[in-house]
Amino acid sequence: MAFKQLFAAISLALLLSAANAAAVIEKRATCSNGKTVGDASCCAWFDVLDDIQQNLFHGGQCGAEAHESIRLVFHDSIAISPAMEAQGKFGGGGADGSIMIFDDIETAFHPNIGLDEIVKLQKPFVQKHGVTPGDFIAFAGRVALSNCPGAPQMNFFTGRAPATQPAPDGLVPEPFHTVDQIINRVNDAGEFDELELVWMLSAHSVAAVNDVDPTVQGLPFDSTPGIFDSQFFVETQLRGTAFPGSGGNQGEVESPLPGEIRIQSDHTIARDSRTACEWQSFVNNQSKLVDDFQFIFLALTQLGQDPNAMTDCSDVIPQSKPIPGNLPFSFFPAGKTIKDVEQACAETPFPTLTTLPGPETSVQRIPPPPGA
């Protein structure tokens, strides 16, 4: 059975289970901290949670380590190729933790440059708590998201066996790849289509770049990198005017705001006829953003796994934080209006947004970790 068909079946089963919950007496295990879970094996993850919130995410911040932990999930998970397997070659294990187990190999791959730092930070937690690297990467990414206001409530399943060999190079999309290349890559990895590719890129709402422009570090993709909102989908459609640093770097195009970076792949996917309307659909539509990202993130972290053999430990993931009440879901940054939009969707008009008051928006870099 193809992965997406299997995943859809599991998702339906989960929905039916939830619908019948009122009629079923659920057996739950009580952990030593007094909290209850659906499976006793999940209790151990509360210790992991407390440890990483304090010692990796610095008290639950949506900062540099959170951003890189989310990035690590994608780079570990997408490294799987059924097409290579059909040719008799090893195509990677997907969400199996190979990027941590074989970090000396995989973090040297060009698209993974910079991930060696977060792998180095995460490894001691894996060793301390005796969990598998694949499960830990998936868990840390979800906890990181829970620290970012506006993020969906994430499901978490355990059961990823340790990888036995590194993923091959060339399976992680690059900022300079064409839209065709990236669509083909995600389709090979999990039969994801062009719309689901856009859903994946919602992660850039809480992300920054350290390795595209060597002259500047911690450059965000939008003006609200600490909030999981649709602002990324607004600002990628604004006309680029300048580079935040040296410019002329492979995979970089001009951005609309000082201090903000725009990678070529985001720019082209936002303007491609196959993806532009889905891209625009997230503008000022937080509920769609949350629902679609929740689905695609779970699907990604089960690539290469049998969902039927995994244990649901979603009870351990903290409740997501709401977006601050003083901020709209989407807006034009100060100094920008509808006239700055390079609209590519021909089907529907661009949503009506307000412009924030004040001088032109200048985006601040993501601060380094405390003590760095």
Curated annotation (Swiss-Prot):
Give any Pfam family that matches. peroxidase
> In which pathway is this protein known to take part?
Secondary metabolite metabolism; lignin degradation
Q: Which InterPro entries match?
A: Ccp1-like, Haem_peroxidase, Haem_peroxidase_sf, Ligninase, Ligninase_C, Peroxidases_AS, Peroxidases_heam-ligand_BS
* Residues bound to heme b: H204
Which sites bind Ca(2+) 2?
S205, D222, T224, I227, D229
Residues that bind Ca(2+) 1, according to the entry? D76, G94, D96, S98
- Name the reaction it catalyses: 1-(3,4-dimethoxyphenyl)-2-(2-methoxyphenoxy)propane-1,3-diol + H2O2 = 3,4-dimethoxybenzaldehyde + guaiacol + glycolaldehyde + H2O; 2 (3,4-dimethoxyphenyl)methanol + H2O2 = 2 (3,4-dimethoxyphenyl)methanol radical + 2 H2O
In this chain, composition skew of type Low complexity spans 350-361
Q: Where is this site: Transition state stabilizer?
A: R71
| Protein name, entry field | Ligninase H8
Recorded hits in PROSITE patterns, A to Z, give: PEROXIDASE_1, PEROXIDASE_2, PEROXIDASE_4
What EC number(s) does the entry state?
1.11.1.14
Name the residues annotated as catalytic in the UniProt entry: H75
What's the record's pH-dependence note?
Optimum pH is 3.
What is the role of this chain? Depolymerization of lignin. Catalyzes the C(alpha)-C(beta) cleavage of the propyl side chains of lignin.
GO MF, one term, reads: heme binding
